């Protein structure tokens, strides 16, 4: 699209729909200026944390100025709808929860990088724009913004060889995925003469050019790399291990959520010509990811790598139900993406607190007898572990039950069986963690310390894990409306 045409047709009134994004951008700019003018001090550290929290809160409040449930703005390059708004609110809340842990983590390491605050804001901005567009250029730029921010944050502690290695792997493979996405976008535009994914999908039929097929495959491949689908996952365990644990939690929760949104938006536009290819390819990738992800997690001794492979397996769970290409499948996928961001972030934040001890090395053996030293952390970690496993009455159980139901409705029973088998495999390492924490008689020589904000964040995540598990319709009703609305809009086009 010609940029002059875009600017000429844009009503300045439409900028009100970007207030949350604009607020985050202003927050990043203010933090950047403060980093330049303020000298290093304890006061500066506290100011950065609280100003970050303030701007995130203002961004949340700015959603109240929006009065549209569906609207294409800026000549159709940006879409305002309930899925985008819900996703962005979730991403902001997850960022709010991560910041206190990141602040404490850097303090404890005696290496305080102020730039990590505005880089986090820029990554959040990329996630927000990624969550609200069907336009190939906006999606590509958003992917770049999130990815570059993650590369930098992964290599935050450059003195560590592991940090360097993980960051380099992430940079190289992430860069390849961006190039693949760009090639895919170029092929799709060349074949369809449109930058809108909705129009591109509708333009496909059985007589279409092979270039459109190649473009779609390349574009989906780029997202498969980003969310860690096997066999495109090689960067993820190393990057998650290399990054500071609060950043790992941020990437595994808000990052995964943002990367999945474009795939979720795609489902209602898979037409009859694409359905068979979509179901076969997506279901095979999902089955491999579920089984191999859990099998690799089973042999890990490092807790961060274990949770990294668990994250890969959960991407497989979400992908499996997307293969059904149904309204129920989309509802289950949206629900599972959101609930994983809660329980996944909670597990990584508990590890972040444990890492504050100099004696902690993230080894599975070190968690033995943890309940003796810190009951709150042990119980919280157990709650998140049971949720990841899918034990009632947690949100993880509801999520997996909905995924299985979504597969059963479309008679994809074999993939449902794979889901059950993968969950059975995961029992081996999840239960081992809980047994070590509560039943192993080992004397722990360290006691984790955490402040009130960290306590509140973990407590809130534990509450949500139980509350949304026991009252699933609180979240489910809203997500059902989102899914039905997306299919309704697709059918009207």
Swiss-Prot record:
* Gene symbol of the encoding locus: nuoN1
Query: Transmembrane region positions?
Result: 18-38, 47-67, 82-102, 111-131, 137-157, 171-191, 210-230, 244-264, 279-299, 334-354, 379-399, 412-434, 456-476
Q: Name one GO cellular component term.
A: plasma membrane
What's this chain's function?
A: NDH-1 shuttles electrons from NADH, via FMN and iron-sulfur (Fe-S) centers, to quinones in the respiratory chain. The immediate electron acceptor for the enzyme in this species is believed to be ubiquinone. Couples the redox reaction to proton translocation (for every two electrons transferred, four hydrogen ions are translocated across the cytoplasmic membrane), and thus conserves the redox energy in a proton gradient.
EC number(s) on file: 7.1.1.-
Q: Which family does it belong to?
A: Belongs to the complex I subunit 2 family.
InterPro entries of this UniProt entry?
Answer: NADH-Q_OxRdtase_suN/2, ND/Mrp_TM
Keyword set, alphabetical order:
Cell inner membrane, Cell membrane, Membrane, NAD, Quinone, Translocase, Transmembrane, Transmembrane helix, Transport, Ubiquinone
Top enzyme category: translocase
Q: Write the protein's name.
A: NADH-quinone oxidoreductase subunit N 1
Q: How does it sit in the membrane?
A: Multi-pass membrane protein
Give the organism, scientific name: Hydrogenobaculum sp. (strain Y04AAS1)
Q: Name one GO molecular function term.
A: NADH:ubiquinone reductase (non-electrogenic) activity
Question: Taxonomic lineage per UniProt?
Answer: Bacteria, Pseudomonadati, Aquificota, Aquificia, Aquificales
Which reactions is this enzyme annotated as catalysing? a quinone + NADH + 5 H(+)(in) = a quinol + NAD(+) + 4 H(+)(out)
User: Where does it live in the cell?
Assistant: Cell inner membrane
The UniProt entry, under Pfam families, shows: Proton_antipo_M
């Amino acid at each position: 699209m010609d940029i002059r045409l875009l600017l000429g047709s844009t009503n300045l009134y439409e900028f009100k729909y970007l207030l949350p994004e604009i607020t985050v951008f202003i927050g990043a700019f203010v933090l950047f200026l403060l980093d330049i003018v303020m000298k290093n001090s304890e006061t500066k550290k506290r100011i950065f944390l609280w100003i970050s929290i303030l701007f995130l809160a203002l961004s949340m409040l700015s959603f109240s100025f929006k009065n549209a449930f569906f609207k294409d703005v800026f000549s159709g390059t940006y879409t305002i709808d309930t899925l985008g708004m819900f996703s962005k609110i979730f991403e902001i809340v997850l960022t709010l929860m991560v910041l206190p842990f990141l602040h404490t983590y850097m303090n404890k390491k005696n290496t305080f990088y102020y730039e990590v605050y505005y880089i986090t804001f820029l990554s959040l901005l990329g996630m927000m724009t990624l969550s609200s567009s069907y336009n190939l250029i906006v999606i590509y730029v958003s992917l770049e913004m999130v990815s570059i921010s993650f590369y930098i944050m992964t290599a935050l502690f450059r003195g560590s060889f592991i940090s360097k290695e993980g960051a380099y792997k992430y940079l190289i493979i992430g860069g390849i995925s961006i190039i693949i996405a760009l090639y895919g976008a170029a092929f799709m535009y060349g074949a369809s003469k449109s930058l809108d994914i909705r129009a591109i999908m509708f333009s496909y039929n059985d007589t279409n050019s092979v270039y459109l097929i190649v473009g779609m495959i390349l574009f989906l491949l780029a997202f498969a790399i980003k969310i860690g689908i096997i066999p495109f996952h090689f960067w993820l365990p190393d990057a998650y291990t290399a990054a500071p644990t609060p950043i790992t939690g941020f990437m595994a929760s808000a990052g995964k959520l943002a990367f999945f949104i474009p795939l979720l938006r795609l489902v209602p536009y898979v037409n009859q010509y694409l359905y068979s290819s979509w179901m076969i390819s997506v279901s095979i990738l999902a089955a491999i990811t579920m089984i191999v992800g859990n099998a690799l997690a089973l042999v890990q001794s490092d807790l961060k790598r274990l949770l990294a492979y668990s994250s890969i397996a959960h991407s497989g769970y979400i992908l499996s139900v997307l293969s059904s290409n149904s309204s129920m499948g989309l509802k289950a996928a949206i629900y599972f993406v959101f609930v994983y961001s809660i329980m996944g972030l909670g597990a990584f934040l508990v590890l972040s607190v444990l890492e504050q001890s100099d004696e902690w090395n993230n080894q599975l053996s070190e968690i033995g007898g943890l309940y003796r030293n810190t009951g709150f952390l042990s119980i919280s970690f157990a709650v998140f572990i049971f949720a990841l496993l899918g034990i009632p009455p947690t949100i993880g159980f509801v999520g997996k039950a909905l995924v299985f139901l979504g597969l059963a409705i479309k008679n994809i029973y074999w993939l449902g069986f794979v889901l059950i088998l993968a969950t059975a495999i995961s029992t081996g390492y999840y239960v081992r963690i809980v047994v070590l924490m509560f039943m192993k008689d080992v004397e722990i020589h360290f006691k984790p310390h955490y402040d009130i904000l960290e306590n509140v964040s973990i407590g809130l995540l534990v509450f949500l894990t139980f509350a949304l598990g026991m009252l699933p319709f609180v979240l489910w009703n809203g997500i059902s409306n989102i899914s039905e609305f997306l299919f309704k809009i697709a059918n009207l086009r």
